[in-house]
């Protein structure tokens, strides 16, 4: 099949028929900052399934999400993960000994703590008899941690799971070059002075050039920013639309922060520094200021900039998941049910960031729901262009038929229900921790707004995606 990003969209003018095909209603910032919808009474059926245990979220917390290179810069990942676990223990008062298993997601691993879930659990005082493992699935690593926990509970293997994620972008592993690594390993194996001198004679100063962590996709050699730029062009998403959406995200996040709606954030006393109490990447600006920024990836004509992209972030999250009967027996009032979920993958070169478009209809069909049934949408915002391209794909019968094998489009999420408390563009995106933030935002919004169903969705590196249905627990 001809790739969507090369034909028929290259050199596409904004006023083309394709742009009209994929047009969406204007994203007026002022219209999207109105008060949240009035609390509404829902009478929809529950998604409980016969003979399958109900899995509930008791509560979840996260450290403040901070710009990398700020207050967390001297920490290690397990420090942040431990802080999230400690915050969860304080928030829920759950006895450590009842936790059956701990699962954390992370992406860029610190080699000293490759199983960061285990190290953080021990540091937080959990029993050394409590197993813990770490998963990685790019930006949906915490989602994978949660759904692994759901599977363990639903199958009867466990009753109580702690799932979460962590990322510390302030201190990523920087390696010696491969030639230098090989030389040092060979020197370590050398048995005589002659062998060592022979190896040392092969040393060259360029061996000392460091090997930085890869920022591009291994399979395509393209950065995610480049892919986002090409995707925005393919779907005729303008620079102005992207900036408007980013401004919306920051403005809504600031409003939510000021009103105390980001209740999942727990204070963290950074050793040797002050206590951090809130996210520090929320920065409402103006369209005029944002328009001054130059393209970050495809220069000089790209539309993805630092202002309409998520930023490198440090942070951790943790969530207490239980079998419903266990939670009630312990006296908890859960916040939400974790219902159906779906993982998808598609061509990483052509459709790297379209995971939500593919995952959403599958999880809705699995749950027997439609877009109209969803009261709170929480999508991961990697880039404004990524979100808006997904919107246009989801709202296109043509895309559904030609690329998804569907007869009708998925449908466009109503903006008045979408990421109402900000998103990754403004709150930050610690790769391994974002999934838990999304689920807790959906659960807390459902309680606040009186809705019943939330839809969480995210894209991920490698052309993968995830979607999950969250159902409010009856009050």
UniProtKB/Swiss-Prot annotation:
Which catalytic reaction applies to this protein? an acyl-CoA + acetyl-CoA = a 3-oxoacyl-CoA + CoA; butanoyl-CoA + acetyl-CoA = 3-oxohexanoyl-CoA + CoA; hexanoyl-CoA + acetyl-CoA = 3-oxooctanoyl-CoA + CoA; octanoyl-CoA + acetyl-CoA = 3-oxodecanoyl-CoA + CoA
Concerning Pfam families, the annotation shows: Thiolase_C (PF02803), Thiolase_N (PF00108)
Q: Keyword annotations for this protein?
A: Acetylation, Acyltransferase, Endoplasmic reticulum, Fatty acid metabolism, Lipid metabolism, Membrane, Mitochondrion, Mitochondrion inner membrane, Mitochondrion outer membrane, Transferase, Transit peptide
Modified positions (N6-acetyllysine) in chain numbering: 73, 189, 294, 299, 333, 349, 362
Q: Can you supply a Gene Ontology BP term from the record?
A: fatty acid beta-oxidation
Entry's Gene Ontology molecular function annotations: acetyl-CoA C-acetyltransferase activity; acetyl-CoA C-myristoyltransferase activity
GO CC annotation: what is one? nucleoplasm
Q: Where is the transit peptide?
A: 1-34
E.C. number: 2.3.1.155, 2.3.1.16
Per the Swiss-Prot or TrEMBL record, the active site comprises 139 (acyl-thioester intermediate), 459 (proton donor/acceptor)
Sum up the protein's function in the record's words.
Mitochondrial trifunctional enzyme catalyzes the last three of the four reactions of the mitochondrial beta-oxidation pathway. The mitochondrial beta-oxidation pathway is the major energy-producing process in tissues and is performed through four consecutive reactions breaking down fatty acids into acetyl-CoA. Among the enzymes involved in this pathway, the trifunctional enzyme exhibits specificity for long-chain fatty acids.
Q: What is this protein called?
A: Trifunctional enzyme subunit beta, mitochondrial
| Organism expressing this protein natively | Pan troglodytes (Chimpanzee)
Q: What is the lineage of its organism?
A: Eukaryota, Metazoa, Chordata, Craniata, Vertebrata
